């Protein structure tokens, strides 16, 4: 079945590897691109530290790194995504019509109309024998939009029946929020600021571990007011929404002189304060915040958000959503929408000039040889 020539509900696989570089999330979803009819199983496979180091070395595509290095990483990551998707499909017994493949972001500079996600859609389609939609950000970026965030379309579909105004906050490496209002208002979305990236970088530098489990180190420290003020002085917070960030937009320099605990506490406060400031760009204050992404597992962040926002702040599991699978589910949903020419972004979510569809469609019989680097 060619998904582009049908309009019924189908099973789709979503594959996501985010800016936190934790690993690959895969999820199954049955949808027609408008509604979610059934949520299937999900799977997460962590990257080993060597893979994270390879990705980290190429973030921002630094000078001195060859095209061959990027292409090799793209191929290897695509093969890993194929293995994870094949496992999920095999375990579920479901035959998907399409796979939504985000790829790994190395660079995001929408002001230069540039966003780089590596991954070979043709190779993935060949390995799985399933059609693939990738390059989901490119049409928006080329049209002058931010290319991010992309998940608001999925949040909007899930939020049917929930009290509004509602904010859905994703705390991955970068924080992003979707504001959902009453009636038929289009969603408003943008990156709020740091998510877990700075805290993870701090823990790696100071303690040699990947994260601050449950915010234990942050809870042991004190917030440094001067360092927090310096962090919040970044130009990004003065820009109107819609807006988006590269993972490495912020620096650890303001906290470098602090103790391990005080630095962690200050970085948690930075994430929470940037979310609180995001309300300035919303049409109305949210009655409730639902949090997904790895940040919802950090108790120090969740406590700081509750103090700073003054309304209910809950993990998305409180309304029956799967916070670990949500972004992968979103890319399954977006793959169906993109294949059928439905909007993925709006002026209120990315600053695009009009509602835009997107994605490159690779039929299951695609021949190998297409470029593995999407620009």
From Swiss-Prot:
GO terms for biological process: 1,6-anhydro-N-acetyl-beta-muramic acid catabolic process; amino sugar metabolic process; peptidoglycan turnover. Its EC number is 2.7.1.170. It catalyses: 1,6-anhydro-N-acetyl-beta-muramate + ATP + H2O = N-acetyl-D-muramate 6-phosphate + ADP + H(+). Disulfide bonds: none annotated. It comes from Rhodospirillum rubrum (strain ATCC 11170 / ATH 1.1.1 / DSM 467 / LMG 4362 / NCIMB 8255 / S1). One of its GO terms (molecular function) is ATP binding. ATP binds at residues 18-25. The lineage of its organism: Bacteria, Pseudomonadati, Pseudomonadota, Alphaproteobacteria, Rhodospirillales. Keywords: ATP-binding, Carbohydrate metabolism, Kinase, Nucleotide-binding, Transferase. Catalyzes the specific phosphorylation of 1,6-anhydro-N-acetylmuramic acid (anhMurNAc) with the simultaneous cleavage of the 1,6-anhydro ring, generating MurNAc-6-P. Is required for the utilization of anhMurNAc either imported from the medium or derived from its own cell wall murein, and thus plays a role in cell wall recycling. Belongs to the anhydro-N-acetylmuramic acid kinase family. Pathway: Amino-sugar metabolism; 1,6-anhydro-N-acetylmuramate degradation; Cell wall biogenesis; peptidoglycan recycling. This is Anhydro-N-acetylmuramic acid kinase. Signal peptide: none annotated. InterPro entries: Anhydro_N_Ac-Mur_kinase, ATPase_NBD.
């Amino acid at each position: 079945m060619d998904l582009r020539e049908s309009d019924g509900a189908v099973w789709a696989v979503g594959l996501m590897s985010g800016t936190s570089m934790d690993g690959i999330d895969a999820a199954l979803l049955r949808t027609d691109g408008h509604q979610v009819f059934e949520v299937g199983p999900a799977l997460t496979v962590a990257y080993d530290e060597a893979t994270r180091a390879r990705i980290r070395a190429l973030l921002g595509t630094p000078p001195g790194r060859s095209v061959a290095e990027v292409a090799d990483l793209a191929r290897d990551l695509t093969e890993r995504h194929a293995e994870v998707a094949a496992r999920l499909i095999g375990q579920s017994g479901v035959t998907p019509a399409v796979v939504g493949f985000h790829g790994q972001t190395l660079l995001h500079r929408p002001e230069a109309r540039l966003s780089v996600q590596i991954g070979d859609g043709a190779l993935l389609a060949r390995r799985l024998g399933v059609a693939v939609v990738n390059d989901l950000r490119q049409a928006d970026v080329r049209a002058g939009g931010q290319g991010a965030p992309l998940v608001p379309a999925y949040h909007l579909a899930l939020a049917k029946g929930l009290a509004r105004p509602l904010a859905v906050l994703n705390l991955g490496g970068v924080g992003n929020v979707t504001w959902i209002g009453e009636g038929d208002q289009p969603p408003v979305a943008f990156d709020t600021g740091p998510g877990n990236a700075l805290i993870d970088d701090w823990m790696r530098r100071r303690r040699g571990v990947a994260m601050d489990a449950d915010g234990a180190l942050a809870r042991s420290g004190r917030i440094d007011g001067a360092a927090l003020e310096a962090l919040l002085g970044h130009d990004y917070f003065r820009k109107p929404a819609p807006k988006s960030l590269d993972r490495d937009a912020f620096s650890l320099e303001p906290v470098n002189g602090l103790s391990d605990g005080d630095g962690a506490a200050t970085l948690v406060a930075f994430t929470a304060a940037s979310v609180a400031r995001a309300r300035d760009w919303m049409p109305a204050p949210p009655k409730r915040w639902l949090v997904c992404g790895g940040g919802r597992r950090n108790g120090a962040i969740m406590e700081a958000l509750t103090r700073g926002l003054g309304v209910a702040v809950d993990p998305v599991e409180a309304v029956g959503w799967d916070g670990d699978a949500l972004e992968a589910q979103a890319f399954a949903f977006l793959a169906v929408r993109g294949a059928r020419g439905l909007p993925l972004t709006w002026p209120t979510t990315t600053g695009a000039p009009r509602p835009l569809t997107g994605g490159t469609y690779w039929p299951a019989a695609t021949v190998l040889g297409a470029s593995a680097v999407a620009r």
